UniProtKB/Swiss-Prot annotation:
Gene that this polypeptide is encoded by: mraY
Name of the protein in question: Phospho-N-acetylmuramoyl-pentapeptide-transferase
Cofactor(s) named in the record: Mg(2+)
Pathway: Cell wall biogenesis; peptidoglycan biosynthesis
Record keywords: Cell cycle, Cell division, Cell membrane, Cell shape, Cell wall biogenesis/degradation, Magnesium, Membrane, Metal-binding, Peptidoglycan synthesis, Transferase, Transmembrane, Transmembrane helix
The keyword Metal-binding is annotated on this UniProt entry: yes
Catalytic activity: UDP-N-acetyl-alpha-D-muramoyl-L-alanyl-gamma-D-glutamyl-meso-2,6-diaminopimeloyl-D-alanyl-D-alanine + di-trans,octa-cis-undecaprenyl phosphate = di-trans,octa-cis-undecaprenyl diphospho-N-acetyl-alpha-D-muramoyl-L-alanyl-D-glutamyl-meso-2,6-diaminopimeloyl-D-alanyl-D-alanine + UMP
Function text: Catalyzes the initial step of the lipid cycle reactions in the biosynthesis of the cell wall peptidoglycan: transfers peptidoglycan precursor phospho-MurNAc-pentapeptide from UDP-MurNAc-pentapeptide onto the lipid carrier undecaprenyl phosphate, yielding undecaprenyl-pyrophosphoryl-MurNAc-pentapeptide, known as lipid I.
Enzyme class: transferase
Membrane topology category: Multi-pass membrane protein
Amino acid sequence: MTQIIIAGAVSFLVAIFTTPVLIRYFSDTGRGQEIREDGPKSHLRKRGTPTMGGLAILAGILVAYVVAGLYGLLTGHEAFTASGLLVLGLTLGLGAVGFADDFIKLFRHRNLGLNKTAKLISQLVLALLFGFLVLRFPNDAGLTPGSTKLSFIRDLKTFDLAVGGTVIGTIVFLIFMYILIAAWSNAVNLTDGLDGLAAGVTAIVMGSYSLMTFWQFRYSCATNFAAGCYQVRDPLDLAVLAAAGLGGCLGFLWWNAAPAKIFMGDTGSLALGGLVAGISVTSRTELLMIIIGALFVIETVSVVIQIVVFHSTGKRFFRMAPIHHHFENGGWAETAVVVRFWLLAAMAAMAGVAIFYGDWLTASGIGVGA
């Protein structure tokens, strides 16, 4: 537990003190966010706001993971595990893609940033590499960081992507990894449209995963082989990463809350999407993440609906997509949209954690007959 607290605290401190350094640098050099002319008119005042604040979040996560890991090694706990390093690598890799996108926008003055093909190929390479490696590195019990079985709270034995054999199964799994990682990274990116929205929602999701992965560690089959135990390779290291993500988002949110003094940019949003995807895969909760991260799902679905309806009928289903802009254009203040969406995200996360805990009660036999 101390290791997890250290990760959250260190990440928060690094992010909260690094962010103003970025604000000063980008303000002094006159490099700031461009604002869409077709967006909400109230957003035009944000033109020139410093961006790439995701660097502070990533710095917090990286430093916290190393510090907490060193503490873990000194105290005899697991640290720098295959699961943790793979998730961290995915997070930093997608952060690098986002950084390239932001860099081109700010320093090369190309408003569209990294072209779609380059971004697509970069995400594809990272997803395939993560998917390939996550099925390697078995521990003494034969557990790998990921599994070809679809997982809700535990692996679903009836839904194995490798049912067609090793070769076909691996191909199907890699395709699934790409869809999953691209979906979550782009979902967080779409949510990052209002001051504090993406950082706040991600903090809620990471807080939930800090609790759940710690619970998986406490009742791991590796140390406590009993009814209801969890077959997860490195739950404590995942809890450390989730806590680091929570701390980093909160430290950044201090400066990103309305009126934002800095935006996270694609550097932050793509990286945090990778963190969400990676932890869901390695904690064996890919499907549960749909509930816990429901706000991200809603934002993404609203864009899909808008595109499909517009191409089918020539009319818009929402005033503007993603859906947070729909409410803005309907007269809601930006802060009202953000706080209400935080509340929705918190309710979804609580529902997910409740389902997770309810499953443990049932699987362990404690909830039987209650």
